[in-house]
């Protein structure tokens, strides 16, 4: 089947025009007018995922994080450029779905809400009329540490960072969440009355500002977005069965998380 058939179905669910302004999105390498037999879904494109794609004879990669985010001045061989050159050598097309999958109803942030049992969720920060990034909703009243422990368990993490002073452990029930690096949206969480904000990559001074505003936070890191790979595989597999597509769909098993904790 042609790659375009699969991507057209995906974009009907998750349109590119939902993406935030300036985002890198859509086809980034190769062609959609090619026959594909195997598709791989990954969070990132790094040397490990490219090697995995080559080994599995993948024709199309769907990734959340674009391998090319800033304009390139050359494609001269180097450790970073070789990731791209290997994709070109093996004729592997690359399609990027970044903030549109964060924003779309039934997408990544809603998958997070399902896992954490966040109910009555609406968008956190409006990006265009009727749509927004992040989610805010409610959970049964519980202690902050209980929620943090659930986040660790659900996402199979060794640790999370708790943003609080003096080991405070208040009861909380209104939760904001944004996958990836969502510190810039913390004021939306404050304005909408969240008790706690779950997001990754929170800066030191941003954490202090949150606490001054009365907002606690749980930082599970950026890599919880790896949920994208399995959930999108499930969705594509369903479309494959409905439409009789002759294509194999796999999710990457290579870890691209650069962090570990001693």
UniProtKB/Swiss-Prot annotation:
UniProt similarity note? Belongs to the GTP cyclohydrolase I type 2/NIF3 family.
Q: Write down the Pfam families for this protein, in alphabetical order.
A: DUF34_NIF3
Please give the subunit comment from the record.
Answer: Homohexamer.
Binding site residues for a divalent metal cation 2: 65, 222, 225
The molecular function terms in GO held by this entry are: metal ion binding
| PANTHER family named in the record | GTP CYCLOHYDROLASE 1 TYPE 2 HOMOLOG, NGG1 INTERACTING FACTOR 3
Q: Which UniProt keywords apply?
A: Metal-binding
Q: List the protein's name.
A: GTP cyclohydrolase 1 type 2 homolog
NCBIfam families in the record:
YbgI_SA1388
User: What are the annotated disulfide bridges?
Assistant: none
Q: Which SUPFAM superfamilies match?
A: NIF3 (NGG1p interacting factor 3)-like
Record: residues binding a divalent metal cation 1: 102, 225
Could you name the domain of life of the organism this protein comes from?
Bacteria
Reply yes or no: does the keyword Metal-binding apply: yes
Organism of origin: Streptococcus pyogenes serotype M6 (strain ATCC BAA-946 / MGAS10394)
A Gene Ontology term for the protein's cellular component: cytoplasm
């Amino acid at each position: 089947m042609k790659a375009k058939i699969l991507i057209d179905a995906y974009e009907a669910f998750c349109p590119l025009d939902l993406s935030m302004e300036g985002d890198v999105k859509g086809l980034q390498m190769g062609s959609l007018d090619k026959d594909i037999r195997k598709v791989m879904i990954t969070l990132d494109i790094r040397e490990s995922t490219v090697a995995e794609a080559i080994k599995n004879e993948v024709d199309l990669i769907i990734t959340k994080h674009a391998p090319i985010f800033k304009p390139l001045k050359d494609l001269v061989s180097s450790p970073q450029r070789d990731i791209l050159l290997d994709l070109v050598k093996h004729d592997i097309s690359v399609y990027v779905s970044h903030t549109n999958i964060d924003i779309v109803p039934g997408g990544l942030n809603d998958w997070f809400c399902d896992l954490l049992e966040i109910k009555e969720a609406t968008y956190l920060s409006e990006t265009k009329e009727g749509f927004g990034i992040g989610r805010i909703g409610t959970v049964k009243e519980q202690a902050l540490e209980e929620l943090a422990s659930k986040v660790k368990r659900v996402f199979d993490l060794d640790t999370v960072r708790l943003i609080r002073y003096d080991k405070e452990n208040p009861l909380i029930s209104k939760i904001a969440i944004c996958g990836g690096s969502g510190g810039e949206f913390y004021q939306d969480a404050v304005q909408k009355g969240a008790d706690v904000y779950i997001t990754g990559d929170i800066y030191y001074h941003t954490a202090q500002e949150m606490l001054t505003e009365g907002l606690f936070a749980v930082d599970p890191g950026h890599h919880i977005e790896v949920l994208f790979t399995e959930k999108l595989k499930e969705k594509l597999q369903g479309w494959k069965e409905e439409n009789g597509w002759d294509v194999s769909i796999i999710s990457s098993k290579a870890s691209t998380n650069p962090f570990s904790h001693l």
